[in-house]
Structures are given as structure tokens and as C-alpha cells.
Curated annotation (Swiss-Prot):
Annotated transmembrane regions: 92-112
A GO term from the CC aspect: mitochondrial inner membrane
Subunit and interaction comment: Complex I is composed of 45 different subunits.
Keywords from the UniProt entry: Electron transport, Membrane, Mitochondrion, Mitochondrion inner membrane, Respiratory chain, Transmembrane, Transmembrane helix, Transport
Lipid bilayer topology: Single-pass membrane protein
Keyword match Lyase: no
Alphabetized InterPro entries for the sequence: NADH_UbQ_OxRdtase_NDUFB4_su
Keyword 4Fe-4S part of the UniProt annotation: no
Entry protein name: NADH dehydrogenase [ubiquinone] 1 beta subcomplex subunit 4
Homology family: Belongs to the complex I NDUFB4 subunit family.
Amino acid sequence: MASGPSRTAAEEYRPNRYVSLPAELDPATYDTPLEKRRAEAERLAIRARLKRQYLLQLNTPKPPRVIEDPALLRWDYARTHNVYPTFRPTPKTSFLGAVFAIGPILFWIAAFKTERVSSAGGVEHQGAPGCKT
């Protein structure tokens, strides 16, 4: 008597406590939850819409002078306006921050102080006309 169909290697695989389960055999790889699939479909729809918008700007008979690439705008925003998640304070950045924050203030204080001292020292006190001092 022949037994039922033989099991495949994936069905016979049992996880080992020393080795993690390969991604190919992990059911979570294939059985994604509905909300995760919806979020992924939404991201793909946004990406397709942005790509279509860019290609329409690029391939019009009278293209605008500046063609805005949404991916480039997002990259530029992430690079310039969103620096705090990737910023690491080091002695160099702390020193440069202090120099650029306090340096101009000290410069203008010194400039006005020396100007006031030099202009006050050159002018001698003169009394009113006809008044002897």
C-alpha cells in the first residue's frame, strides 16, 4: 500500500533554535495582513501618480521652463529641512555652532566699542563761545 503524497522539504522543515527561519519558508512573507497590503497599494498608487505627473510635464509639446521632479523635491526636503533625525552633535559641530551664533555678536560689540572710543578721544571738549573754562 502506498501512503499519501510525499511531503516537500518546505513542509518537513522544522525551525531550529540555533538557526532562524529562512524568508522563503516564513509564512509572514506571503500572508501579509490586509492593512499592510492596503498601505503598500496606496504607496504604489502615489508613486505611479507622481511618475505620471512628471512624465506629462516632461513630454508636453510646450514644456515649462522648470520641470519639477517630485522625487527630487522629496530628496531635497529630506536632505535640507529634516536634518535633526540624522544630526549627531560632535565637538566640531558644537564649536561651529557657537562661533556662528556668538561670533557676529562679539564682532559688532568690538566694532562699535572701538569706533566710540576712537571718535571720543579725537574730539576735545570746547566750551561755549564767550565762556571761559
